[in-house]
Amino acid sequence: MAVTAAQVKELREKTGAGIMDAKRALVETDGNMEAAAELLREKGIAKAAKKADRVAAEGLTGIAVNGNVAAIVELNSETDFVAKNDQFVALVKETAELIASKKPATNEEALALETASGITLEAELVQATATIGEKITFRRFAVIEKTDAQHFGAYQHNGGKIGVVSVVEGADETLAKQVSMHIAAMNPTVLSADELDSEFVKAELAQMNHKIDEDNASRVLVNKPELPHHEFGSKSQLTEEVLAAAKASFEEELKAEGKPEKIWDKILPGKMAKFIVDNTKVDQQFALLAQLYIMDDSKTVEAFLESKGAKAIAFTRFEVGEGIEKAETDFAAEVEAAKAGL
């Protein structure tokens, strides 16, 4: 039977298939719309299966807020070009909204959710893989909840390559969003330095001091003074005994310099503050509250928020592709393989 343009248009709107794929499906099923849609679905699963072993490390984050619930998701594609595709962008948005609405606990639960199309999210991804032509995957999500007294800071950077949701108490959405902008830029991994494992701190401190050794090797060559090692890396290592010893050392310095004791109280706080800053570098790299705030680097994030009567409660930061090992493509080898008919 002859297939009309109206039938092709209807099937494309229903399935997202290309013009020729829709037309062929209608021809094969004698114009039966439901059968044609099922045929396209089956072909889509087959196409998706062929792409299953490909690495999808590009993509976008998506954020949706539904009252006191926010969701952040990451969907991946194989190329950045597809990540900018309107269908992919819409799929990311729909997925974030679905997660915020249904609050699944696991990826398995999320993939089983019914979408606006009446099919599961998993089926929607298979369909997208078939119609877009690249492997599309749902990698991860987080559901974040707050109270009425708290605010979400939702922020996406670089077109959605980085997504952040923060929860801030005692502030408005503007300040909460600024905190999320800081998180996007500075990439903290924990809220407070108290969350950093002691062995992790030791390992990071050793790496920092190794970097100082490398820098010092270069500085010696140009007759620059060597930089000192950091003795400590975290506030958790600055015990009362350590701080007392540092204070005593500074007092000895002031005494040796001939500074009268009556002015020591004006000098010591500054020296102690610098000692703490110099010996909490691991905290400053990984803990949000210990980092210098990018909007006012005279204060830590914690101190800045306190000055505004606010407090950071939690945050989640996704960066597209982090932790995914991308396949390295040797273009010359691909050309040679094509020539050889491999």
Curated annotation (Swiss-Prot):
Q: What are the UniProt keywords, alphabetically? A: Cytoplasm, Elongation factor, Protein biosynthesis
Write down any Gene Ontology CC term: cytoplasm
Region (Involved in Mg(2+) ion dislocation from EF-Tu): which ranges?
79-82
Q: Extract the InterPro entries matched here.
A: EF-Ts_dimer_sf, Transl_elong_EFTs/EF1B, Transl_elong_EFTs/EF1B_dimer, Transl_elong_Ts_CS, UBA-like_sf
User: Which branch of life, at top level?
Assistant: Bacteria
Q: Which residues cross the membrane?
A: none
Q: Which Pfam families match?
A: EF_TS (PF00889)
Tell me where in or outside the cell this protein is found. Answer: Cytoplasm
GO MF terms, alphabetically ordered: mannan binding; translation elongation factor activity
Describe the function of this protein.
Associates with the EF-Tu.GDP complex and induces the exchange of GDP to GTP. It remains bound to the aminoacyl-tRNA.EF-Tu.GTP complex up to the GTP hydrolysis stage on the ribosome.
Q: Which family does it belong to?
A: Belongs to the EF-Ts family.
Protein's name according to its UniProt entry? Elongation factor Ts
Gene encoding it? tsf
